[in-house]
Amino acid sequence: MASKKMREEATCSICLHLMTNAVSISCGHSYCHVCIVSFFENLNRMTPGLKTFSCPQCRAPFTMASLRPNKQLGNLIEVIKEMDQEMSCEEHGEKLHLFCEDEGQLICWLCDRGAQHKGHATALVEEACQGYKEKLQQAVTKLRQLEEECMNLKVFTAEQITKWNEKIEFQKQKIQSDFKTLQRFLHEEEKSYLWKLEKEKEQTLRRLRDNEANLEQKNHELQSHILELENKCQGSAQKLLQDVKDTLSRSWAVKLEQPEALSLDLHTVCNVSELYFDVKKMLRRHQVSVTLDPETAHYELILSEDRRQVIRGCPQENLDNSSRRFSALPCILGYEGFTSGKHYFEVDVGEGTGWDLGVCMENVQRDTVMPQTPQSGFWAIRRCKEGYVALTSPLTSIHLTEKPLVVGIFLDFEAGVVSFYNMTTGSHIFTFPKASFSDTLRPYFQVYLYSPLFLPPPDE
């Protein structure tokens, strides 16, 4: 039911009913449109030509032109009418003061006594309202929990979308990088095979042309002998018999040596389909032998005699304090340096739980802890507790479906490319953005506890 104050605001002070087509005058008071117009007309009849009128409530002056529809008040009146209609029993016209629990309906006192609600549990509206308000609040609490859960799921789904897009982008870059690497390799292989084919062509052609030249020379000799014999046959008897035995002897002594037998079978044969799908073969064409440089080893690193294996252990004594030695981190460099060309080497990481692998500039800092990023002269990847990352700035997460037991590292010095491969599966791991190398590059390793590294020889 509408409050007393609401009803007072919606009641016209002229007709004392809820306003119809409420309008306001300049002082702010409102009236029914019909009532205030009738008020004007009555005053005009008493005082013809009157232009200014006094508000029936506050006596403030106003004019007819100041009338304005009061939509807000009109809306309030409609609400009050609906409330009045809802709060009255449609059957009996009585106020709905009771609530039937069995039917879940508002009823009046006559309904309560009728046959329809006989024996039903009823309560005063105020009492029933309090109980149901608590239940509604409980329902609101539950729905808010569901709303919060829904929002959390929405956030989770948005994160999944982001992660999925990142995964797709990573895979896209990986595919593009793999094909670029493959295209470079195929281009180099094409040039290599064409060069070999051209070389084989020239070698065989040179021998064939030698045969051709020898046969040409022999043909001239035969033609000379034939001409000599034909001239004798066509001459006089005395001329024919002159030195005839010597001429015959020389003629019968002429032999035709067979040219060098040459096979026309091609030795330079390229199976493009095999090249295309054999990544391991592709990389190992550039494989170099890498050993460890003991003069760069951190004092906790222990090398094998052949300098192909390193493990982290107790600090080594009696080591010199060379500026070439890593003193801040347990790192070591490969003995070999690269200043041009393509190079590939492998590192057997086994079941190790941590390692850094890659290449670095010859002049990197070795006595201070610093980020091992390309900006500092390092191009390396890492395995740690969190998984696999490329040492970029910021770090780049690497998602691998299979754990590499052997990691292949490929360097194209002129192209500025450093790539990493899982040689357990032959799949690409990561390629750094193109760089410009200005210094000698050397293989780089950081050794973790219980994670030895082994550099297999190229023929293994």
Swiss-Prot record:
Organism of derivation: Bos taurus
GO biological process: innate immune response; positive regulation of canonical NF-kappaB signal transduction; positive regulation of viral entry into host cell; protein sumoylation; protein ubiquitination; regulation of gene expression; regulation of viral entry into host cell
Main function: E3 ubiquitin-protein and E3 SUMO-protein ligase that acts as a regulator of innate immunity. Acts as a negative regulator of type I interferon IFN-beta production by catalyzing 'Lys-48'-linked polyubiquitination of AZI2/NAP1, leading to its degradation. Mediates 'Lys-48'-linked polyubiquitination and proteasomal degradation of the critical TLR adapter TICAM1, inhibiting TLR3-mediated type I interferon signaling.
Subcellular locations according to the entry: Cytoplasm
Keyword field: Cytoplasm, Immunity, Innate immunity, Metal-binding, Phosphoprotein, Transferase, Ubl conjugation pathway, Zinc, Zinc-finger
Residue spans, zinc finger RING-type: 12-59
The name this protein goes by in its record: E3 ubiquitin-protein ligase TRIM38
Main location group: cytoplasm
Annotated residues for binding of Zn(2+): 89, 92, 111, 117
Catalysis: reaction(s): S-ubiquitinyl-[E2 ubiquitin-conjugating enzyme]-L-cysteine + [acceptor protein]-L-lysine = [E2 ubiquitin-conjugating enzyme]-L-cysteine + N(6)-ubiquitinyl-[acceptor protein]-L-lysine
